[in-house]
Curated annotation (Swiss-Prot):
Encoding gene per record: yuaD
GO CC annotation: membrane
Name under which the protein is recorded: Uncharacterized membrane protein YuaD
Transmembrane segments: 10-30, 34-54
Main location: membrane
Organism field: Escherichia coli (strain K12)
Membrane topology: Multi-pass membrane protein
Length: 187
């Protein structure tokens, strides 16, 4: 399956626009020898665009496999159990259980509630967490509320954010030891 990136589509639009503008200028000034090259470049861009975008345009009924590895718990969803992922987890609903993302990001949005332990590289809290949180970076937003025990290296609490319980700043040496223990525990 061919890869497609929306940034290329935007870039191709500007290249095609530049070629079209150059084509009009050359036609108006009478430089017909360059006109041939500009038309050729414009056709190449159009064919290139159809090659990559046309696949999406004419493939009715085919569901394209997503490259995204983000786990999303939607607003009206309740989940009981543990979640383990290597990437990003976005929580809009409710989770009763533990969340483990070794090098990932956990984002608990406004209205999202987690009862359990969260282990992650970065935690963005705009909802509620009741339990334990161990992360490298913790950002508590305006609506964020954490009740329990927190271990972090970097902490930011915005106006309105709240942490109640035990708060521990972890040094690099302790963080490395914790990482080794987590890896040993998973083995």
């Amino acid at each position: 399956m061919r890869a497609y990136c929306p940034h290329y589509q935007f870039m191709l639009f500007w290249i095609a626009s530049l070629c079209w503008f150059s084509l009009i200028v050359l036609w108006g000034t009478g430089f017909y020898s360059l006109l041939f090259y500009i038309i050729s470049v414009l056709l190449i861009i159009i064919l290139y665009t159809l090659y990559f975008i046309g696949e999406n345009m004419f493939s009715k009924g085919k569901i394209k496999e997503s490259d995204s590895t983000t786990t999303i718990i939607s607003k009206n969803t309740s989940f009981v159990g543990d979640i383990s992922s290597g990437e990003k987890i976005i929580i809009h609903g409710k989770i009763n259980g533990n969340i483990n993302t070794n090098n990932g990001v956990v984002f608990i949005d406004k209205g999202g509630v987690v009862n359990g332990r969260v282990l992650c590289e970065k935690m963005i809290l705009n909802g509620e967490l009741y339990g334990e949180c161990c992360c490298s970076t913790l950002d508590v937003y305006e609506n964020g509320f954490l009740q329990g025990e927190v271990s972090y290296r970097f902490l930011e609490i915005r106006n309105g954010g709240c942490i109640t319980g035990i708060v521990n700043k972890v040094t690099d040496e302790v963080q490395n030891n914790v990482s080794e223990l987590v890896k040993a525990r998973e083995s």
